[in-house]
């Protein structure tokens, strides 16, 4: 897979074309301040155009796709987003309004008669998100932290739970989770389905504000442990191994260039293609033979 880039005289990316396992191309235009104002994405013979507009402070005020999907934004004097209006490809608008406390922390997000309330501890870390909804009633996400303000536990509105451990240097050692990770956030449930965006995953009645005792007995805890490359300026996760409470285990190894470029399992390789904004535009998975994980791991100092 090969990607060719083209730049203007000041280093702005103008064109990007990937060939081989992926056939995808991008072109970009910019305003005088260097902000992207236009993107053209061509993939599989289909072209999607996106345009971006900004205010005098460089804050994004609108995003419009040729599909008809649109987002508009408004801000207060402190630069906090106070309104986000999403217009689906069917022309239906959804307006989300946000408010903040004196510390510029988000305190509420409102969609009509539904809202999410956010609370924080004395260190400024979010401890709860509570959705009050006509469709779902009251749903709560809760967060807990250690003395260093590192997230140690997340308990979701549907019983999904995560626990985290760290080493003495603050690097995450492991993540344990139970429940179905294929779920929507409270913010997604607040806005609801919008034409042009992926459909939300609605919780069942039995999932609403469930706790661990309510979880189906067949669900297992799974723990992921991380291996780091310490030779880089910013430590990179070079592999992660996930083991279920039943003993099943799988490892994924990662390769990097300027970004993460590939992931390897025992029988597959996933290659990543990025757009000009640094977001993953494509993930291409193909089967491989042999010790894919072992061959992907670099010979470096690592920490578990």
Task: Show where each model-derived region lies.
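Short, solvent-exposed aromatic-acidic interface loops
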Residues: 241-245
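Alpha-helical "lid/cap" subdomains adjacent to substrate-binding clefts that gate access
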Residues: 233-239
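Extracellular, surface-exposed repeat architectures
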Residues: 104-110
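Residue-level markers of secondary-structure register and packing in elongated scaffolds
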Residues: 1-15, 27-33, 37-40, 45-85, ...
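GD-rich hexapeptide-repeat beta-solenoids
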Residues: 26, 95-101
């Amino acid at each position: 897979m090969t990607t060719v880039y083209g730049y203007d005289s000041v280093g702005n990316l103008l064109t990007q074309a990937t060939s081989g396992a992926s056939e995808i191309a991008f072109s970009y235009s910019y305003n005088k301040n260097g902000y992207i104002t236009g993107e053209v994405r061509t993939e599989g013979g289909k072209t999607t155009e996106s345009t971006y507009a900004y205010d005098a402070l460089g804050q994004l005020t609108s995003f419009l796709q040729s599909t008809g999907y649109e987002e508009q934004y408004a801000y207060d004097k402190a630069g906090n987003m106070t309104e986000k209006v999403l217009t689906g490809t069917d022309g239906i608008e959804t307006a989300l309004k946000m408010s903040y406390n004196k510390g510029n922390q988000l305190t509420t997000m409102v969609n009509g008669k539904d809202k999410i309330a956010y609370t924080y501890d004395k260190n400024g870390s979010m401890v709860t998100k509570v959705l009050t909804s006509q469709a779902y009633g009251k749903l709560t996400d809760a967060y807990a932290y250690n003395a260093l303000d590192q997230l140690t536990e997340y308990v979701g509105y549907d019983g999904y739970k995560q626990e985290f451990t760290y080493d003495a240097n603050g690097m995450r050692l492991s993540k344990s989770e139970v429940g179905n990770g294929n779920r929507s956030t409270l913010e997604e449930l607040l806005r609801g389905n919008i034409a042009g965006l992926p459909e939300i995953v609605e919780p069942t009645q039995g999932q609403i504000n469930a706790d661990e005792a309510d979880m189906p007995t067949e669900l297992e805890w799974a723990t992921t442990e991380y291996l780091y490359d310490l030779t880089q300026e910013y430590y990179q996760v070079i592999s992660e191994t996930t083991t279920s409470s039943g003993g099943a285990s799988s490892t994924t190894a990662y390769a990097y260039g300027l970004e993460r470029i590939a992931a390897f399992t025992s029988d597959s390789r996933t290659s990543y293609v990025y757009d000009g904004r640094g977001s993953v535009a494509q993930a291409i998975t193909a089967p491989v033979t042999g010790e894919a994980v072992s061959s992907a791991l670099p010979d470096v100092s690592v920490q578990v």
